[in-house]
Amino acid sequence: MDHSMSKKLHDEALLHIVGGVNSPSRSNKGVGGGIPVTMERANGAYFYDVDGNKYIDYLAAFGPIITGHAHPHITEAITKAAQNGVLYGTPTKHEITFAKMLKEAIPSLEKVRFTNSGTEAVMTTIRVARAYTGRDKIIKFAGCYHGHFDLVLVEAGSGPSTLGIPDSAGVTRSTAEEVITVPFNDLTSFKEALAVWGDQVAAVLVEPIVGNFGMVAPAEGFLEAVNELAHENGSLVIYDEVITAFRFMYGGAQNYLGVIPDLTAMGKIIGGGLPIGAYGGRVDIMEKVAPLGPAYQAGTHAGNPASILSGIACLEVLQEEGLYDRFEKYGSMLKEGIEKAAIKHGIAVTVNQIVGALTVYFTDEPVTNYAEAGATNGDLFGRFFKGMLEEGINLAPSKYEAWFITSAHSEADILETIQAVDTVFGKLVQGK
């Protein structure tokens, strides 16, 4: 494929934008470098770049675009919002409609509040949990990304009984020491952390199904045990459902798995492609939020009509009968096709697939936590990513990210993708 215009634009972007991108995940650093492709437009399941190349898209903007690009119903809602004014700074009736839709879909949301992003939603749930419990520390799980605010940019110390250390320049050690990080799916380490720090732990922050070191499901009984142990300790359980809400069913991963948290943070899908976040939970906890309580949270753009109307429209689309069954069908087809191609070419892969989301790890070992994901072959993934791009398949440029199937993908798209995987695997074994 010709990428000359993408290269020209990236060179120009480097002169004006830090790193040439507005989020590091859009660079190709995670796949061995190279020029990120600059897109011109998107429609349905397809991207079109500035050089005129077409791609089947599984990036889905890192998750929000579950209905495909430029869905007519969502486009109509956004157009209506633009015509009537996109920002008021006052309440609107649409906020009520959307809040009710979220509550009906995810019953643990007894009260909700809108924010501008998933990062803001997670950040505020932690503040509210601290206000409710009077404690300061949180427990999180290694490799789970919860946004770019200081408190969660923390990596594990030397073990579950040690405090976290900064995972980014600019994060202070004192901030990092408010976080205890333990391996996902490891109850022994979780119990040890509670034994050491229990009376200081305000909340346990959990991705109920991990989406940030690939798609990783909880081990049987793990989430139930986390809930029970946290509550015995007087700590709250916060589910970060920024990726998972409405991903696997019309509702949250908590509905899908049947395990209920105290607070939930959401984003991505619920905005229909526009910036949004939301959090909610038990009434007695949510009443700690201003103006009712002492935990302050605000936002100029929070609950703006454009994002709210886009979110309402997205959820209306997701109520289509049989949609999530189709996600499961196509996800299973893709998993099976990738695994067959891998066997054919003698390439070791593990495919973690949950409904319409999956991750291809270059390893013959199961991946159940961050350490196992980190041990997979990143160099081979980088070559695979670039090969797939040349075959017209757009993936996230990182071995830790997921492929997302949208309502716009067709069976023909899935079959074309499987053929591309077969072609690229063939080239990989030839050293190309």
From Swiss-Prot:
It catalyses: (S)-4-amino-5-oxopentanoate = 5-aminolevulinate. Gene3D superfamilies: Aspartate Aminotransferase, domain 1, Type I PLP-dependent aspartate aminotransferase-like (Major domain). InterPro entries: 4pyrrol_synth_GluAld_NH2Trfase, Aminotrans_3, Aminotrans_3_PPA_site, PyrdxlP-dep_Trfase, PyrdxlP-dep_Trfase_major, PyrdxlP-dep_Trfase_small. Pathway: Porphyrin-containing compound metabolism; protoporphyrin-IX biosynthesis; 5-aminolevulinate from L-glutamyl-tRNA(Glu): step 2/2. The modification N6-(pyridoxal phosphate)lysine is found at residue 268. It is found in: Cytoplasm. One of its GO terms (cellular component) is cytoplasm. GO terms for biological process: protoporphyrinogen IX biosynthetic process. GO terms for molecular function: glutamate-1-semialdehyde 2,1-aminomutase activity; pyridoxal phosphate binding; transaminase activity. The keyword Phosphoprotein does not apply. It comes from the Bacteria. Signal peptide: none annotated. Its cofactor is pyridoxal 5'-phosphate. Its EC number is 5.4.3.8. Keywords: Cytoplasm, Isomerase, Porphyrin biosynthesis, Pyridoxal phosphate. Belongs to the class-III pyridoxal-phosphate-dependent aminotransferase family. HemL subfamily. Homodimer. This is Glutamate-1-semialdehyde 2,1-aminomutase 2. It comes from Listeria innocua serovar 6a (strain ATCC BAA-680 / CLIP 11262). The lineage of its organism: Bacteria, Bacillati, Bacillota, Bacilli, Bacillales.
